Design a protein with these regions (language model features):
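Active-site-adjacent structural elements that line small-molecule/cofactor binding pockets in enzymes
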Residues: 1-155
Length: 155
């Protein structure tokens, strides 16, 4: 949510003003989540997201995000590791603090309240990735119904 508030929304507001638009564009967030039906699945998701973020944050495109959260040295360290072919060690730099700061984390039962806390009143919608296992769809649909009641952004 901090990225949306401090970087994305000011940029959108500036663009709206420059274009003399009567309203702001809709904001739909597609943030990755650390989630699953139970604690073990959340732990597995955490490890997957640790590896994904380590790779993404090794690219210069994410340097501004790292600076926003007070980790300006993290990107260059990750880039050095990728240049040296040290792919296996990237995840070690992605601490739990980093993950918990940038990604909503919790079981499916906890997720609606967590997302309300992160994004309620801030965005117009949330893009949520369904589980890979279709046998979990019915259970996940309950979570999606609850997420559907999150307060949208009000202009």
């Amino acid at each position: 949510p901090r990225f949306v508030r401090e970087l994305a929304m000011p940029a959108l507001d500036s663009g709206v003003e420059q274009a003399r638009r009567p309203d702001r564009p809709r904001i739909i967030t597609a943030s990755p989540l650390i989630t699953g039906p139970d604690v073990d699945a959340v732990d597995r998701s955490r490890q997957t997201q640790r590896a994904v973020l380590a790779f993404l944050y090794s690219t210069p495109a994410y340097q501004r995000t790292l600076e926003l959260f007070g980790w300006p040295e993290l990107g260059p360290r990750l880039r050095t590791m990728t240049r040296n072919g040290d792919w296996a060690s990237l995840g070690a730099l992605m601490t739990d603090e980093v993950l918990d700061t940038v990604l909503p984390t919790g079981t499916w039962d906890q997720l609606p309240d967590i997302l309300e806390g992160w994004y309620g009143g801030l965005v117009d919608g949330l893009l949520i990735q369904p589980p890979e296992d279709p046998s979990l769809d019915a259970r996940f649909s309950e979570t999606l119904r609850a997420i559907g009641s999150i307060r949208p952004r009000l202009d």
